[in-house]
């Protein structure tokens, strides 16, 4: 931000109001005509001033939402306007650091010396200025790089119920991706999980090229909402430097819940399942800031916590329409020890055709067809009622379950390059094609394939590769 913009953000005269009442976490102030989004401080009689933000108006009063608890606030306290807009200090020195929603270090180290500034809430790149996405981003996870290939600048959702392993999956991406910079936003996390994620899921190597923005569940809703904007602003800064950035947010659901608190406190009417309109207005504003620009790219993965395993609950349903694809984590697969528990048939990457070769896409289609054929007949197979030879495709699907699951399962510390993921996928396709040809020939001759049993195995296929359990 240039010096002119900085000067314009500072009010030329002091604007002062007084506290009239509090309601929940909001403070109503009289004689304080500050704009929405402006920053103010409440002068308490004891303790330092309390920072707050203008979130709306009610009758003749201005409604503020504080960044900390309201302890010490009383009727008549003076409220002073401090700034009408916000910016962040940024720079390469943020790499390897853990910061809060205000950009301050919380990792016990000295504050980084940052010389650059960026706007806290930037406008997304103009649609006509966005280049097409044509290059793939390697996540290091075979199930994604092989069957759900993502492009640099794509926005994906990771949908799962609690305890299925989405945090572990995001940590694997941060460790194994080929992105230049990783920005991780932990919104509404339990306090104990922050260090666990940094030390166990991310590791020293992942942290060295990452910026971690943290707002735990005990912090006010405004802080949790700002954490998402702070992380996105930092990702935008590195994108402007020509970097390919990977933004990981856990989770977009908690961001929506925090905005619901703010919206209801500001007097918005509750709509679908108690969510006010501002939630559904704010999510696309946040998501559209990511993507590709003429300088670089921000590839974003947003974790979405699915309430009661219902994929059609309001937040999940709205987010699917905003993003360029989704990765669905299955509790059923997780219960079988299949990690990462990615349900390939329920997942989708809309940009995969633009960033993969024809051969790769055909191989992915073949594996999907085999997985679908097995799922359609799984009940018959599990009770031994399926008769081998009745359907050559199902016969091959049964035979290929072990190698396919071996491809999809992956240990946390295991990294698969793009070449390895693609090469293994093509080998699976060739093996499936050979088996299908033999099965079709045997079916035409009225015989079972050589060495095949007459009935499909009754046992459920397990994951042959050991993997870490989710949190």
Task: Please name every model-derived segment.
Residues 1-3, 24-27, 41, 59-60, ...:
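A broad, low-specificity signal for short, low-complexity segments enriched in glycine/proline
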Residues 1-139:
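Acidic-enriched and Gly/Ser
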Residues 2-3, 80, 139-144, 231, ...:
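Phosphate-interacting basic helix/loop segments used at nucleotide- and nucleic-acid interfaces
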Residues 77-79, 93, 106-154, 167-172, ...:
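P-loop NTPase nucleotide-binding/switch module
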Residues 146-147, 153-471:
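P-loop NTPase catalytic core
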């Amino acid at each position: 931000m240039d010096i002119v913009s900085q000067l314009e953000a500072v009010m030329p005269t002091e604007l002062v109001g007084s506290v009239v009442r509090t309601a929940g976490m909001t403070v109503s102030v009289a004689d304080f005509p500050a704009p929405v989004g402006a920053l103010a401080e409440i002068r308490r009689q004891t303790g330092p001033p309390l920072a707050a933000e203008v979130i709306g108006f009610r009758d003749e009063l201005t409604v503020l939402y504080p960044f900390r608890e309201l302890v010490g606030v009383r009727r008549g306290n003076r409220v002073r306007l401090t700034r009408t807009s916000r910016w962040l200090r940024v720079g390469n020195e943020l790499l390897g650091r853990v910061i809060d929603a205000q950009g301050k270090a919380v990792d016990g180290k000295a504050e980084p010396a940052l010389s650059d500034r960026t706007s806290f809430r930037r406008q997304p790149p103009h649609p006509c200025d966005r280049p097409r996405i044509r290059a793939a981003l390697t996540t290091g996870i075979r199930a994604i790089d092989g069957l759900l290939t993502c492009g640099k600048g794509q926005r994906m959702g990771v949908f799962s119920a609690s305890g299925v392993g989405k945090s572990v999956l995001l940590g694997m991406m941060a460790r194994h991706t080929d992105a230049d910079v990783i920005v991780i936003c932990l919104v509404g996390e339990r306090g104990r999980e922050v260090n666990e994620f940094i030390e166990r899921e991310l590791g020293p190597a992942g942290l060295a090229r990452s910026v971690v923005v943290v707002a735990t569940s005990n912090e006010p809703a405004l802080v949790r909402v700002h954490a998402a904007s702070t992380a996105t602003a930092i990702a935008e800064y590195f994108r402007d430097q020509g970097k390919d950035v990977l933004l990981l947010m856990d989770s977009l659901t908690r961001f929506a819940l925090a905005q619901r608190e703010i919206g209801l406190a500001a007097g918005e009417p509750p709509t679908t399942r108690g969510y006010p309109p501002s939630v559904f207005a704010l999510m696309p504003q946040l998501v559209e800031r990511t993507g590709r620009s003429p300088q670089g790219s921000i590839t974003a993965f947003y974790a979405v916590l699915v309430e009661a395993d219902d994929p059609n609950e309001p937040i999940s349903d709205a987010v699917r329409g905003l993003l360029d694809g989704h990765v669905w984590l299955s509790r059923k697969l997780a219960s079988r020890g299949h990690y990462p528990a990615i349900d390939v048939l329920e997942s989708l990457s809309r940009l995969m055709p633009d960033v993969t070769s024809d051969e790769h896409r055909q191989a992915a289609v073949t594996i999907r067809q085999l997985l679908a054929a097995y799922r359609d007949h799984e009940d018959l197979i599990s009770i031994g009622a399926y008769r081998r030879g009745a359907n050559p495709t199902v016969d091959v699907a049964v035979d290929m379950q072990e190698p396919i699951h071996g491809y999809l399962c992956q240990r946390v510390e295991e990294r698969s390059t793009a070449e390895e993921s693609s090469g293994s996928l093509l080998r699976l396709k060739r093996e499936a094609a050979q088996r299908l040809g033999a099965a079709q020939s045997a079916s035409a001759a009225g015989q079972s394939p050589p060495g095949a049993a007459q009935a499909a195995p009754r046992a459920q296929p397990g994951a042959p590769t050991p993997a870490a359990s989710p949190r």
